[in-house]
């Protein structure tokens, strides 16, 4: 009954604290069936104690009871209280409270059981899929190669453990490396879209979005911009013009001045250097947290694309001999920027790098282990599933993933479907040996620690009494921040224990204060300084931060630490070095005891000023300590261990001096010059990618093959080898069809290259051949018809009504039309023919869910025979989307998967050979109830390292598998890049629902018209199911979206007039 005695004590404490009923419900996210109706209020209150809006003793005691005692003890307590049957209000409340806590404990146990079952099932699925992938790849693996794989894995582990290239150990080495790369003119794009980002006076710690990542990306951009070989660096972020933030965050561009131009000086051009470029997207007058940015990501991508295109032209004139200078790499930071970088990388066909900073799956696992919230509750608060899907997309699209530590690779990225360390090593070994990977790809994981600027740091020598030794023996004026800190202390000369972190629960500052307060010897020997961001009024801080700060103040009062703890309200970013100097002058210690620290940049900063460290052993500090060897690692949950480590360092002068010396000796392994060298060395290993129609050789000679005319004239000759013959393909097998298509393509391409080689402008081609595709450049507006949720007859009628509504503009040529569909081009042709619509009524056709882009052709010479279709395919578009396309290896896996699904005797999926193309593998769904939702199919492909975009179409009756970065929305961006069709001048017409890529058609800077009415098909649950809600990714209240009932010409005309596409009737 000892357990029950503790429970009784806690229950009495809860009653004394008051508000028990509400606190109990909040402590575990509610209880009983009625709790489900509380909606968002319950979700917000169900945050764990250290992340809630206000400190509550009742919540604390409830959580202690639920987490610390067995369900049986709780049941016995309830039985005892129920048996008392006392009419007193207190006993009645005690009985009710005991029952509710008992049920909450049962709920917690149930959640834990469900999560354990889910994880076990997930492990089995991964093992099965990866065994299949390993067996598939081992078919042609020789015994010698199998043996070599072991050595490869070992060497890879050693390389990743080191986490960096050999460091630049001297100024001579730096200068030698600089001279080797000075002739390069690289353009690098970095992306970090949340938080408040500016080059000077950064408001670090103002909120949870403005922390270490902000400082890292700014300093990385600054350092890269000063590195030889780099001409320009753009750090793209969000433009914020909100009244509650400084005006500087609304400036479109901010130049980052180099910290040290001596070592990294190079010839500066007109647009060279590093810049913060702020792209307007989302609410113009609001500063919103990162969880609310997801619906606006595509708008950012479109704005960033415009900037990059403009800058590429400018740099082409300055350093590219007139040719566009594309970014050598696009580097996303955190999941939201990674999602943006993936789309930009796909649109521009340039390599992508990703740095996670913190990862969604790791956070989800930690929250689920606590058992206080369900998966749905966590997702509602943090939009965690949308974040995880973005991180999975980053694995699909990135060539390199940069991490700070080895732990992040093994323990955090290992949680993702798209990454497996063992398979990554095998694939890399096969690539080195030239062995087929069967369409499988894995990004390269590289541990590269963040850098730091040391040029302005001059650690002072400290004598045995703790006084600074000046060369002239005279003192110097103390910085003002010293007085702001020392006014808190009754004895300011005692060694200072310094913690610098925002008041966030995961920073674990409350445990530090407890450790300090309960260790009498430490209190007598040292002072504690807590630099916890900036604040004016505690009640005006965010709820989470104010709760933590209130807890700290109460602990200071509890342990009577007045005169021993400093917690200044304000400090400037420029004063942080002075704070480090003060701690070093007093022979103090720097501490970071966060529960998990992804890297720990402040530990490096402190070491640079001669401060030993005490740091958490969870995460990046482990790697930092391995290099610097300047302190002690501790368990952040063990306050006694924290206190003993601090006491040991401040009390042992020899140990303190040795740790200080080690840190200063090794600190330059974390310098920005070395970081940039390692970074650019990795970038240099990437295969250059850029749009293929750009001429890559000497610009003084204009080659016909590089002109837009020849690019599409060769397309005429190949003329859509998607089996344009309508009557010969059905009888052939897939293998023979593909072989014949390839042979025909080679022959016709050869004829096109060798015959009639003459320079011809786009305009001349239009005049001589009658082709309409160049007209895209001259359209003022483009109407994109992308309606998936209607029958063919309704779609034909909608097209005709749109033509009628815009008849005047059609005749004048100011408005053009694009049909965007999941159909193959042969199906499009049949649809148009059935409705009496000419192909030339459209400027372009986006087919096969965005894997093919075609243009109409009215010239009979363009067609290979009368049976072939009047379309031309854009081969340049294929070069844009072919990145990581698995081809025949992917097709083989899909066929096996479809066969496995049909093992029960009933056919579930059948390959649709007619509608498949080189970059689209199409299936017909025979049994919609037996096929998994898209998220499960994507998961299956990712586990096997197959990178593709899987989507259901035609109300779930068809399945298309296309390249991972191909989509109908990406095809619209290609039209902008290739032909200059402004995205803001496009209007996309959609239904109320659509294919599983529907969300991509709604976001962005283009206008959107949604057709509502009973003619829309009811979404099929198979393809409508997603891991996150549509509202998490689409903002339906943005100005560019409107809805109309039906699809009559008058309603359509009114909507088009609303967006300024049509002129009002005079």
Curated annotation (Swiss-Prot):
What pathway does the annotation place this protein in? Glycan biosynthesis; sucrose biosynthesis; sucrose from D-fructose 6-phosphate and UDP-alpha-D-glucose: step 1/2
- Indicate, by first and last residue, each region the UniProt record lists as having compositional bias (Basic and acidic residues): 143-162
What does UniProt note about where in the body, tissue by tissue, this protein is expressed? Expressed in germinating seeds.
Q: How is its activity regulated?
A: Activity is regulated by phosphorylation and moderated by concentration of metabolites and light.
* GO molecular-function term, one example from the UniProt record: sucrose-phosphate synthase activity
The answer to keyword Glycosyltransferase applying to this record is: yes
Name the SUPFAM superfamilies on file.
Answer: UDP-Glycosyltransferase/glycogen phosphorylase (SSF53756)
Q: Where is this region: Disordered?
A: 132-166, 688-714
Family membership, please give it: Belongs to the glycosyltransferase 1 family.
Q: What is this protein called?
A: Probable sucrose-phosphate synthase 4
């Amino acid at each position: 009954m000892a357990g029950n005695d503790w429970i009784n004590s806690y229950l009495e404490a809860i009653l004394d604290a008051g508000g028990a009923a509400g606190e109990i419900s909040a402590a575990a996210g509610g209880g009983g069936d009625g709790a489900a109706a509380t909606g968002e209020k319950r979700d917000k209150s169900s945050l764990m104690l250290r992340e809630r809006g206000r400190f509550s003793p009742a919540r604390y005691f409830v959580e202690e009871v639920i987490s610390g005692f067995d369900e049986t003890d709780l049941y016995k307590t309830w039985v005892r209280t129920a048996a008392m049957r006392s009419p007193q209000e207190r006993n009645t409340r005690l009985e009710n409270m005991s029952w509710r806590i008992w049920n909450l404990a049962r709920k917690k146990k149930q959640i834990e059981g469900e999560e354990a079952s889910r994880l076990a099932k997930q492990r089995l699925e991964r093992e099965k899929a990866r065994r299949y992938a390993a067996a598939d790849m081992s078919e042609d693996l020789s015994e010698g190669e199998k043996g070599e794989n072991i050595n490869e894995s070992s060497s890879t582990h050693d390389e990743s453990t080191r986490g960096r290239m050999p460091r630049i150990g001297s100024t001579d080495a730096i200068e030698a490396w600089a001279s080797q790369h000075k002739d390069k003119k690289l353009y690098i794009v970095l992306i970090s879209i949340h938080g408040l980002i500016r080059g000077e006076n950064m408001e670090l710690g103002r909120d949870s979005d403005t922390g270490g990542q902000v400082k890292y990306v700014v300093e990385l951009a600054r350092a890269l911009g000063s590195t030889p070989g780099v001409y320009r660096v753009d750090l793209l972020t969000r433009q914020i013009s909100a009244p509650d933030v400084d005006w500087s965050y609304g400036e479109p561009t901010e130049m980052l001045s180099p910290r040290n131009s001596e070592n990294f000086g190079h010839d500066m051009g007109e647009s060279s250097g590093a810049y913060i470029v702020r792209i307007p997207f989302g609410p113009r007058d609001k500063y919103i947290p990162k969880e609310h940015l997801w619906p606006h990501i595509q708008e950012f991508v479109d704005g960033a694309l415009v900037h990059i295109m403009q800058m590429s032209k400018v740099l082409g004139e300055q350093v590219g001999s007139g040719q566009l200078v594309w970014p050598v790499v696009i580097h996303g930071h955190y999941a939201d920027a990674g999602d943006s970088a993936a789309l930009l990388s796909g649109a521009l066909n340039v390599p992508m790098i990703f740095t996670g900073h913190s990862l969604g799956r790791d956070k989800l696992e930690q929250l689920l282990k606590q058992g206080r919230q369900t998966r749905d509750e966590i997702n509602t608060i943090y939009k965690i599933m949308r974040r995880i899907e973005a991180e999975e997309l980053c694995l699909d699209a990135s060539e390199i993933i940069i991490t700070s530590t080895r732990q992040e690779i093994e323990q955090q990225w290992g949680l993702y479907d798209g990454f497996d360390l063992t398979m990554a090593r095998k694939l890399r070994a096969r690539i080195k040996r030239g062995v087929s990977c069967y369409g499988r790809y894995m990004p390269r994981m590289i541990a590269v620690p963040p850098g730091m600027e040391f040029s302005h740091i001059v650690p002072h020598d400290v004598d045995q009494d703790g006084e600074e030794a000046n060369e002239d023996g005279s003192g110097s004026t103390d910085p003002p921040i010293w007085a702001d800190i020392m006014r808190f202390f009754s004895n300011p000369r005692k060694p200072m224990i310094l913690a610098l972190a925002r008041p966030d629960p995961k920073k674990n500052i409350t445990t530090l204060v407890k450790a300090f307060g309960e260790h009498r010897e430490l209190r007598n020997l040292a002072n504690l300084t807590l630099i916890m961001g900036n604040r004016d009024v505690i009640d005006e801080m965010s709820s989470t931060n104010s709760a933590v700060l209130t807890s700290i103040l109460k602990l200071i009062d509890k342990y009577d630490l007045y005169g021993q703890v400093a917690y200044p309200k304000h400090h400037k970013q420029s004063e942080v070095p002075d704070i480090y100097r003060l701690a070093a002058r007093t022979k103090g210690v720097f501490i970071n005891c966060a529960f998990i620290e992804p890297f720990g940049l402040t530990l490096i900063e402190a070491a640079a000023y001669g401060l030993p460290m005490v740091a958490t052993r969870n995460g990046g500090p482990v790697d930092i300590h391995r290099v610097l060897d300047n302190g002690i690692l501790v368990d952040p949950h063990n306050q006694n261990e924290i206190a003993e480590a601090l006491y040991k360092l401040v009390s042992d002068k020899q140990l303190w001096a040795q740790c200080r010396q080690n840190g200063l000796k090794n600190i330059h392994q974390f310098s920005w010059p070395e970081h940039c060298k390692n970074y650019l060395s990795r970038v240099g290993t990437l295969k250059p990618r850029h749009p293929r129609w750009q001429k890559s050789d000497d610009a003084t000679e204009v080659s016909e093959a590089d002109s837009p005319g020849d690019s599409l004239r060769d397309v005429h000759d190949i003329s859509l080898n998607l089996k344009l013959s309508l009557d010969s393909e059905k009888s052939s097998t897939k293998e023979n069809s593909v072989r014949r298509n390839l042979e025909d393509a080679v022959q016709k391409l050869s004829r096109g290259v060798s015959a009639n080689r003459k320079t011809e402008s786009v305009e001349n081609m239009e005049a001589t051949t009658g082709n309409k595709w160049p007209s895209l450049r001259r359209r003022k507006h483009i109407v994109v018809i992308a309606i998936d949720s209607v029958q063919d007859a309704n779609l034909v009628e909608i097209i005709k009504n749109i033509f009628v509504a815009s008849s005047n503009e059609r005749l004048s040529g100011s408005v053009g039309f694009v049909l965007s569909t999941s159909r193959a081009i042969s199906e499009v042709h049949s649809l148009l023919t059935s409705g009496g619509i000419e192909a030339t009524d459209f400027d372009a056709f986006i087919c096969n869910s965005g894997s093919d882009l075609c243009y109409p052709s009215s010239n009979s010479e363009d067609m290979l025979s009368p049976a072939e279709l009047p379309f031309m395919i854009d081969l340049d578009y294929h070069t844009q989307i072919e990145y990581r396309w698995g081809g025949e290896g992917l097709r083989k896996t899909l066929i096996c998967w479809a066969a496995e699904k049909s093992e029960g005797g009933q056919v579930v999926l059948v390959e649709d050979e007619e509608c498949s193309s080189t970059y689209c593998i199409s299936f017909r769904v025979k049994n919609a109830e037996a096929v998994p939702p898209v998220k499960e199919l994507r998961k299956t492909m990712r586990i096997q390292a197959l990178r593709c975009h899987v989507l259901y179409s035609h109300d779930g009756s068809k399945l298309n598998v296309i390249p991972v970065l191909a989509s109908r929305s990406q095809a619209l961006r290609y039209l902008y890049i290739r032909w200059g069709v402004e995205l803001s001048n496009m209007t996309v017409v959609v239904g109320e629902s659509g294919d599983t890529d529907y969300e991509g058609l709604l976001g962005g800077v283009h206008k959107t018209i949604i057709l509502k009415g009973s003619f829309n098909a009811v979404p099929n649950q198979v393809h409508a199911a997603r891991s996150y809600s549509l509202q998490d990714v689409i903002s339906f209240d943005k100005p560019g979206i409107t809805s109309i009932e039906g699809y009559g010409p008058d309603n359509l005309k009114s909507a088009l007039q609303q967006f300024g596409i049509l002129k009002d009737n005079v």
